[in-house]
């Protein structure tokens, strides 16, 4: 079915169409792949390739994304199975809400440390290199390269170790982010920092989850 056909079904029978989409693997796998890709991008490209050290809130955000990956994969096993679908929904909601919470905190810290007014740092809690994950999961010990914070919150500019020789491509990216004093979606204009980009990703997922879950609930109520 093409996009026009899907749009027609959504307009004529929105609830049934949304429920039918949930019973297919595509949406669940799309969520898992999207969040997994963001984790890999943050780790492999920005952390390893560009030497942007992750902070405490950054690894918490990775945890939230990882929860959503697991939820999407569980639901994708059989989206028509109510138990598996419910587990996927709960994990997706939990991950997106938790991700928004950590992203908001990181955004507040980012604005405080980049504010020329020293009073803006008053009351701002600093970052720890010894993270405490939900349920006391020892992720920093299990996978330190992925979940061990080594940077400071709010400061995400590349820090290249002494003696490292960068390729021309690495040098271009590193200089761009160093000049902008951190990660931005559009570095020259300081448009959308990393925390705000994560807020957008989690927020979009949460809105879609609310819509999908609402349609599922209406379908159950109607019988």
Curated annotation (Swiss-Prot):
Major subcellular site: membrane
Keyword Protein biosynthesis: no
Organism: Escherichia coli O6:H1 (strain CFT073 / ATCC 700928 / UPEC)
Result of altering residue 58 to S: Loss of activity
Source taxonomy: Bacteria, Pseudomonadati, Pseudomonadota, Gammaproteobacteria, Enterobacterales
Transmembrane segments: 26-46, 58-78, 82-102, 198-218
Protein name: Protein-disulfide oxidoreductase DsbI
SS bond partners: 55-58, 127-153
Keywords: Cell inner membrane, Cell membrane, Disulfide bond, Electron transport, Membrane, Oxidoreductase, Redox-active center, Transmembrane, Transmembrane helix, Transport
Gene: dsbI
Topological domain ranges for the Periplasmic compartment: 47-57, 103-197
């Amino acid at each position: 079915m093409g996009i026009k056909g899907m749009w027609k079904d959504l307009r004529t029978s929105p609830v049934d169409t949304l429920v039918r989409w949930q019973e297919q693997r595509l949406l669940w796998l799309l969520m898992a792949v999207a969040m997994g890709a963001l984790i890999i991008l943050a780790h492999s490209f920005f952390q390893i390739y560009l030497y942007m050290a992750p902070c405490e809130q950054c690894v918490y955000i990775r945890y939230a994304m990882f929860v959503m990956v697991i939820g999407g994969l569980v639901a994708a096993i059989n989206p028509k199975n109510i138990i598996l679908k419910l587990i996927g929904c709960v994990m997706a909601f939990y991950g997106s809400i938790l991700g928004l919470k950590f992203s908001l905190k990181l955004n507040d810290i980012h604005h405080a440390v980049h504010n020329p007014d020293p009073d803006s740092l008053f009351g701002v809690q600093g970052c720890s290199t010894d993270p405490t994950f939900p349920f006391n999961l020892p992720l920093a010990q299990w996978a330190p390269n992925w979940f061990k914070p080594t940077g400071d919150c709010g400061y995400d500019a590349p820090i290249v170790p002494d003696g490292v020789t960068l390729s021309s491509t690495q040098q271009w990216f590193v200089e761009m982010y160093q000049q902008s004093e951190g990660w931005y979606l559009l570095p020259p204009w300081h448009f959308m920092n990393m925390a705000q980009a994560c807020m957008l990703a989690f927020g979009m997922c949460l809105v879609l989850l609310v819509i999908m879950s609402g349609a599922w609930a209406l379908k159950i109520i109607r019988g």
